[in-house]
């Protein structure tokens, strides 16, 4: 079976937004207009097609990014196609800050993105976070100012906020006609026509009109700004413009595309997905301005086993190249079992093919291959470069792994995942739950690399670690629903860390003589603090063979064995470096084990000598509140050991930014609701680790002693 759609007709894009900007509703409308779903699912009544986990439907927030394939051709009147049919692979991403990891994974495999803004709130904290992630992955994007029907909707304020908050240059390609309950449609600034939506057919039809007189001047002013930005993309167009010749419509579209792909500016359009207005303009813009796999530079990978990770193996969107793909998400499907969502970068994959997971050096075989629509699936026999598909039955593959042709191996990505900052103890209620819980936790951890499961050696408890209270709540909830595990959950605990405050040198000799072969090892270690966030490093500065090479791994193993449990309260030790500067050995009595024991004892002594101190996670907190509650909220944050960084106004609300220790933020949402009669909202994410004040450090040490 040959490729059905040429690559230039592919668009792999994601929809990214702050929680509540209307992402699921917008995706629903896209699926409805592109003919894939026949009844509109509203998040308000918990029936959206993309939100396929039961919980998402209850909580009304999107948790997992489902990948969907659908088709669209550009149309201006809703009836006449102006382009061939394009194939859209849409990845729905969550907007809640506890799920940033999901967004990170999906951005790694997207070519472009549609960023949704709430027309009233504009650029919100989570939008900024996701925007920065998209900048890091160099993802071109367009902006849809959604919810123009909301009270307080302000398109021009959103445009200004894009510039102020993200530093990007917004380029409106459409203006709303009216706002709030008077939203009639949009003005297309490229063709200079009005799109006026009619009637009850859920926005599937609209009328194209000339721009009404009272809006003509404003439309011309904004079109002028758009053209000035666009002609900067091309010298010839610039010269023609300076001579008084404006680009025609196809040229203007081509110039906007060029500017969008180079990220010189961001096209902005408007509407209301809920009121079925303006979504088709977004679909047209995806075709016109977002990249196809051919517009994206070749993906540079490195050879498996290359420690330097020199990226010198290109894989571009071409069926003739060797097969290479990235597994970016694992999901449990109640009918098919484990599904691995995979993006093909190059080559062709057929059912039954052998492939290699080059990240782990393991072989995998292609069983069932599926093209996913949010909840329905279509079995396929082969997939091509640029496709996003789901593979069933892979045994070894987890998120971020590369799958490739066994004869032409490459590793595409090393995804970095943040350290968890919050943990809870979980205990199964019955013996039967014990086994099910182990299986459930292993499955959930395979799906979500920002979630870790560990066993506390001393208490034997199972510890779940994650990115926030909501993150762990939802995982516990999924354990109950999907795996039918009943468990008791402990109170959330902070993931403290320990570090050192000064340099120290330790000379330690380990001797043991018990008849027969003894044990002997001497090590001299230099321990130094490093910059926050640098982690741990070890080097050997041994010259002249004072410690033979074969014993040095034992030294490092001994050092590492102490890192998991620091001297103050048994928390992991971070941000320090160790050098082995001298030592001594015995021809008969020395061994790797003897050096491991010596290094372990030296390290324990060294950490105490180097002034061990306790660190706690500090969260960046943003509270948005009506003005009358500002004073009380700031007072409350300060009482939680918070450092208020500043205030800002957004529309008619005040925005308070602060750094607050995580230990003092548990259950904050309830306090905030009662202080503000439910009108203030907050978001927080982990920012950095900082030293715990001495009096609190003493309390923590007593508690964990």
Swiss-Prot record:
GO biological process: ribosome disassembly
SMART domains in the record: EFG_C, EFG_IV
Domain tr-type G residues, every copy: 8-294
Assigned keywords, A-Z: Cytoplasm, Elongation factor, GTP-binding, Nucleotide-binding, Protein biosynthesis
Residues annotated for GTP binding in this entry: 17-24, 92-96, 146-149
Transmembrane residue ranges: none
InterPro entries: EFG_II, EFG_III, EFG_III/V, EFG_IV, EFG_V, EFG_V-like, EFTu-like_2, G_TR_CS
One Gene Ontology term of the molecular function aspect: guanosine tetraphosphate binding
GO terms for cellular component: cytoplasm
Pfam families recorded: EFG_C, EFG_III, EFG_IV, GTP_EFTU, GTP_EFTU_D2
Compartment annotation: Cytoplasm
Signal sequence coordinates: none
Main subcellular location of this protein, as a coarse class: cytoplasm
NCBIfam families linked to this entry: EF-G (TIGR00484), PRK12740.1-5 (NF009381), small_GTP (TIGR00231)
Entry similarity comment: Belongs to the TRAFAC class translation factor GTPase superfamily. Classic translation factor GTPase family. EF-G/EF-2 subfamily.
Role according to the record: Catalyzes the GTP-dependent ribosomal translocation step during translation elongation. During this step, the ribosome changes from the pre-translocational (PRE) to the post-translocational (POST) state as the newly formed A-site-bound peptidyl-tRNA and P-site-bound deacylated tRNA move to the P and E sites, respectively. Catalyzes the coordinated movement of the two tRNA molecules, the mRNA and conformational changes in the ribosome.
Record-given protein name: Elongation factor G
């Amino acid at each position: 079976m040959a490729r059905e759609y040429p690559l230039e007709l592919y668009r792999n894009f994601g929809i990214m937004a702050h929680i509540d900007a209307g992402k699921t509703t917008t995706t629903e409308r896209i699926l409805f207009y592109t003919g894939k779903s026949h009844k509109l699912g509203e998040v308000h009544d918990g029936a959206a097609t993309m939100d396929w986990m039961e919980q998402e439907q209850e909580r009304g927030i999107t948790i997992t990014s489902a990948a969907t394939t659908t088709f669209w051709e550009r149309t201006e009147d809703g009836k006449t196609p102006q382009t061939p049919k394009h194939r859209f692979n849409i990845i729905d991403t969550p907007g809640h800050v506890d799920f940033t990891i999901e967004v990170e994974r999906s951005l790694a495999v997207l070519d472009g993105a549609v960023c949704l803004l709430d027309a009233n709130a504009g650029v919100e904290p989570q939008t900024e976070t996701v925007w920065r992630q998209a900048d890091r992955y160099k993802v071109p994007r367009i902006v849809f100012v959604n919810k123009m029907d909301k009270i307080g909707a302000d398109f021009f304020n959103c445009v200004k906020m894009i510039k102020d908050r993200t530093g990007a240059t917004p380029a409106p390609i459409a203006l709303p006609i009216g706002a709030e309950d008077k939203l009639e449609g949009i003005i297309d600034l490229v063709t200079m026509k009005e799109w006026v939506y009619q009637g009850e057919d859920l926005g599937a039809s609209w009328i194209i009109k000339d721009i009404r007189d009272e809006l003509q001047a404003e439309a011309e002013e904004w079109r002028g700004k758009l053209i000035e930005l666009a002609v900067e993309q091309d010298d010839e167009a610039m010269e023609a413009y300076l001579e008084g010749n404006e680009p025609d419509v196809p040229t203007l579209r081509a110039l906007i595309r060029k500017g969008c792909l180079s990220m010189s500016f961001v096209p902005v359009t408007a509407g209301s997905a809920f009121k079925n207005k303006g979504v088709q303009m977004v679909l047209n813009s995806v075709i016109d301005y977002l990249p196809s796999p051919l517009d994206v530079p070749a993906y540079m990978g490195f050879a498996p086993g290359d420690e330097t990770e020199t990226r010198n193996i290109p894989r571009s969107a071409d069926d003739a190249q060797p097969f290479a793909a990235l597994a970016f998400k694992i999901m449990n499907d109640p009918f098919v079992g484990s599904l691995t969502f995979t993006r093909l970068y190059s080559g062709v994959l057929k059912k039954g093919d052998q492939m290699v997971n080059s990240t782990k050096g393991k072989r995998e075989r292609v069983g069932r291959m599926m093209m996913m629509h949010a909840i329905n699936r279509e079995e396929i026999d082969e997939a091509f470069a640029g496709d996003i598909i789901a593979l069933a039955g892979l045994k070894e593959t987890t998120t971020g792994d590369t799958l490739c042709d066994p004869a032409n191996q490459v590793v595409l990505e090393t995804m970095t995942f943040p350290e968890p900052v919050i943990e809870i103890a979980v205990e199964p209620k019955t013996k039967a739950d014990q086994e099910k819980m182990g299986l459930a936790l292993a499955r959930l951890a395979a799906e979500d690399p920002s979630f870790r499961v560990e066993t506390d050696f001393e208490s034997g408890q199972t510890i779940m670690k994650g990115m926030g209270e909501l993150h762990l709540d939802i995982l516990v909830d999924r354990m109950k629903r999907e795996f039918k595990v009943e468990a008791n959950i402990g109170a959330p605990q902070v993931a403290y860390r320990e570090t050192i405050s000064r340099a120290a040198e330790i000379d330690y000799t380990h001797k043991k003589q018990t008849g027969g072969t003894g044990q002997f090892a001497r090590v001299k270690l230099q321990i130094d603090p490093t910059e926050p966030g640098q982690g741990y490093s070890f080097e050997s500065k041994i010259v002249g063979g004072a410690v033979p090479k074969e014993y040095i791994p034992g030294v490092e193993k001994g050092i590492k064995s102490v890192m998991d449990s620091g001297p103050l309260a048994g928390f992991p030790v971070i941000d320090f470096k160790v050098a082995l500067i001298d030592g001594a050995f015995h021809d008969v009595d020395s061994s790797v084990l003897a050096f491991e024991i010596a290094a372990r004892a030296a390290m324990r002594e060294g950490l105490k000598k180097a002034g061990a101190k306790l660190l706690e996670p500090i969260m960046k907190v943003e509270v948005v509140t009506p003005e009358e509650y500002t004073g009380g909220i700031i007072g409350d944050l300060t009482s939680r050991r918070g450092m208020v960084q500043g205030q800002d106004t957004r529309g008619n609300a005040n925005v308070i930014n602060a750094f607050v220790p995580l230990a003092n933020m548990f259950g904050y949402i309830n306090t905030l609701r009662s202080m503000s009669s439910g009108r203030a909202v907050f978001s927080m994410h982990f920012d950095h680790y900082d030293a715990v004040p001495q009096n609190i450090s003493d309390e923590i040490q007593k508690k964990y002693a």
